């Protein structure tokens, strides 16, 4: 519900 600074995966679950 926020997601991704530089290179995360599929974090916004």
Swiss-Prot record:
Domain C-type lectin, first and last residues per copy: 11-13
GO molecular function annotations of the record: toxin activity
GO cellular component terms given for this protein: extracellular region
Compartments, as annotated in UniProt: Secreted
Transmembrane domains' residue ranges: none
Tissue expression summary: Expressed by the venom gland.
Keyword annotations: Disulfide bond, Hemostasis impairing toxin, Platelet aggregation activating toxin, Secreted, Toxin
Family that this chain belongs to: Belongs to the snaclec family.
Assembly: Tetramer of heterodimers of alpha and beta subunits (alphabeta)(4); disulfide-linked.
Primary role: Activates platelets by binding to the platelet collagen receptor glycoprotein VI (GP6).
Protein's recorded name: Snaclec convulxin subunit beta homolog
Organism the protein comes from: Crotalus atrox (Western diamondback rattlesnake)
